[in-house]
Swiss-Prot record:
Species lineage: Eukaryota, Metazoa, Ecdysozoa, Nematoda, Chromadorea
Protein localization: Nucleus
Predominant location category: nucleus
GO CC terms in record: nucleus
Organism, as annotated: Caenorhabditis elegans
Protein name: Nuclear hormone receptor family member nhr-108
GO MF, any single term: sequence-specific DNA binding
């Protein structure tokens, strides 16, 4: 995979490197990133203007820019292909991560089509648009992403339903946070945005603008948005997940335990799959972080922050119904009560 070079900075992130890997001077982490992307053949989503800063402390911020820089400095796809044995390639395709990447790619493609994201100009999202968008997106998630988990299940349909119902809202909250890494606003699955500092955009009337009920809704619910924002900024954003880590967390969320109405067989299957996911996550972090045990703990710690966010959503949903506030019919509120 590599040959020795003089002590030079990695041409992707600037980390000190002693090797030429896949045709260019690069550190071990960037070379492994490049290899994984070539082997998996998964689409790399682009959520930026193509000019992200990729210093050694920020190289995981944007996969798209990192991959393009790998190509720009001369890293060769054909070298990866020529050095990947047939049996190794087959083994990689059978990992949970590779299956998750393909399923998530299908979900993103379906969103491109349904929401016309390639031609859409992002805008602030009103509460009614937010409700409509999540109602559509939940169906897309069920069809294109949850299908992967169910394909690995030996459970009866009612137990698959228990897991998928538990998964939907947690996945949606985690994904919105993941899309917001390094950005000042929350980016929704249809590419519209929510800015916590401009909640009037959320609660205003879709056609006429401001109205009294919208103002009341904003005043009452603002603290819930702020509580959620604090959790994100202090516990989630600093971890700076990459897409693979995000997908591993998705798997841990789906194969959870202690869920209401979960059968003994379902619990055993979830524990078995979680063990496999954690094994893959640990191996993944070993190739990226010298202190990989700490990184694994940081990634898994996001699940606790996610539970805090879920609690905030449940409370705001209850308040919205009691006071008949705008947004009370949001599908995410309904999902927290199932």
């Amino acid at each position: 995979m590599s040959k020795k070079s003089e002590n030079q900075p990695c041409m992707v992130c600037g980390e000190i490197s002693y090797s030429i890997r896949f045709g260019a001077v690069s550190c071990r982490a960037c070379a492994e990133f490049f290899r994984r992307k070539i082997v998996s053949k998964a689409r790399i989503p682009k959520r930026c203007n193509g000019a992200c800063d990729l210093g050694k402390y920020h190289r995981k911020t944007c996969q798209s820019c990192r991959f393009q820089k790998c190509l720009k400095i001369g890293m060769l796809e054909k070298v990866v292909a020529s050095r990947t044995p047939v049996n190794r390639r087959s083994e990689n395709n059978q990992t949970i991560l590779s299956g998750l990447e393909k399923a998530y790619d299908k979900l993103e493609n379906s969103r491109d089509n349904v929401f016309d994201r390639k031609n859409k100009i992002p805008k602030y999202c009103n509460h009614q648009e937010l409700d409509d968008m999540f109602e559509i997106d939940i169906k897309l998630i069920s069809t294109h992403f949850i299908q992967f988990f169910e394909s690995k299940s030996s459970l009866e349909n009612n137990q698959n339903k228990v897991l998928s119902t538990h998964f939907i809202i947690r996945f949606s909250l985690l994904e919105v946070a993941f899309r917001a890494f390094g950005k000042p606003t929350y980016i929704l699955p249809n590419n519209d945005i929510i800015d916590v500092s401009k909640l009037d955009k959320v609660y205003q009337h879709l056609e006429t603008g401001e109205d009294e009920r919208g103002k009341n809704s904003q005043v009452i619910l603002q603290r819930f948005w702020q509580m959620n924002e604090k959790t994100m900024k202090t516990e989630v954003f600093p971890v700076n997940l990459d897409q693979s880590e995000f997908l591993f967390l998705c798997a841990l969320i789906y194969w959870d335990f202690g869920i209401e109405n979960q059968s003994e067989k379902c619990l055993e299957e979830c524990q078995r799959m979680r063990t496999q996911v954690l094994k893959e996550l640990t191996e993944y972090e070993k190739s990226n972080y010298p202190e990989n045990e700490l990184r694994v703990a940081q990634v898994i710690g996001i699940l606790q922050a996610l539970q805090k966010t879920l609690d905030v959503i449940q409370h705001s949903g209850y308040i919205s119904n009691v006071y008949n506030l705008k947004g009370k019919q949001c599908p995410l509120y309904e999902a927290t009560n199932e």
